[in-house]
Amino acid sequence: MEEFQRYLELDRSQQHYFLYPLIFQEYIYALAHDHGLNINRSILLENAGYDKKFSLLIVKRLIARMYQQNHLILSTNDSNQNRFLRRNKNLYSQMISEGFAVIVEIPFYLQLKSSLESKGIVKSHNLRSIHSIFPFLEDKISHLIYGLEILIPYPVHLEILVQTLRYWVKDASSLHLLRFFLHEYCNWNTPNKAGSSFSKRNQRLFFLLYNSHLCEYESIFIFLRNQSSHLRSTSSGTLLERIYFYGKIKYLVKVFVKAFQVNLLLLKDPFMHYVRYQGKSILASKGTPFLMKKWTYYFVNLWQCHFYLWSQPGRICINQLYNHSLDILGYLSSARLNPSMVRGQMLENSFLIDNAINKFDAIVPIIPLIGSLAKAKFCNVLGHPISKAVWTDLSDSDIIDQFGRICRNLSHYHSGSSQKKSLYRIKYILRLSCARTLARKHKSTVRAFLKRLGSGLLEEFFTAEEQVLYLTFPRASSASQRLYRRRIWYLDIICINDLANHE
């Protein structure tokens, strides 16, 4: 986001939060294009056509059309009458929505930067790694007992998202443009498929709206958590303040003025940790089942009474962490009991002590991974490898490089797994899929092709994980072989991969 600095040198008092004119600037679409190249890279498939959609000529043509009068007038009777989006509707809408998402992120970025500077955090990018959540779980979750797995409800009406964003963006024209997109592509009377299609084509804008909504919900939750504990939550400092937030809290206290303090006394728990990922969140605690049920009650009432979201208690599951696995970011994580025996000796007497401690464990889930490979046409639903037909036009070296890249990325992302058997099976499927693809290209059988090629094809896949490991540890180090079998979390991963986004 530092690219904004050279374009935002104007005095803030002169801007008056008028973001709408930025939609006519070419550099906004250049920033959106650069962001798309970095984020929209797939671990399984390359987005080959993404670069062609954002040519300078198309951007200039789009801006010229927007300058013409009445092109952004929304027709409530027939959306086909809208001349602006009659041609290249999907392309133009995607370009405008991604550019609009870049613009709306500006007030968020400015307040976040000022918040980080006030706290003395200079290099905020060091905190961005997705894998940074797992060392936290290793340190904390083994000492906790219960966990709430929460499915965060979506807003029943997208106007709620607009109202939430209204307190961040003071420009009414920008909000009208946002409503234009929501009405045009998420017709309120159609099934959810339309909204799903909109969110997939305009991921950056959709995630911005959704995260701004979650920020409001988490603000009140962290307020309750801080009031109920003698130890203040360290994570609350990362949430940005809003002008109207204290008004909400004042209203909340006014509603529960009689029973507020009494109820909060029942929720005191200094050992409480909250983690959110995708549309789920985990609230882990060292408390009792009664305390967990009280928090479930508060979550349901908070969603229904203050955010107008219909939710049921069944969306919140209370689990004991030592015998339940958490499905988080492509891993099955658990805090299982690990028995150990210690021999002690006092004078002439020796004795054995049985001790069971909780140990954090992260396993690669095989079934969702096979489902993701089947969706990408590397195997069938049973896990039997098949050829990748769309890659048969590539050269042999390019095909091997494509499969090798996928294996290296999988080894990189799932390097923190304590049990690598599932990962080895996935790599075996990819290896045979590569062999079938090459055999199909040369119109031969897999056995004949492998016999003719030799072991050169297999070397790429067997050494993939070692190449990732030696990026950190020297190949000549004697300790590398021992570390190869241990769990290593790579803290440079800032994007979740396709296989962790299984549905």
From Swiss-Prot:
Stated role: Usually encoded in the trnK tRNA gene intron. Probably assists in splicing its own and other chloroplast group II introns.
Family: Belongs to the intron maturase 2 family. MatK subfamily.
GO biological processes: mRNA processing; RNA splicing; tRNA processing
Compartment annotation: Plastid, Chloroplast
Name of the protein described by the UniProt record: Maturase K
InterPro entries (UniProt xref): Domain_X (IPR024937), Maturase_MatK (IPR002866), Maturase_MatK_N (IPR024942)
Gene Ontology cellular component list: chloroplast
Key words of the record: Chloroplast, mRNA processing, Plastid, RNA-binding, tRNA processing
Gene name in the database record: matK
GO molecular-function term, one example from the UniProt record: RNA binding
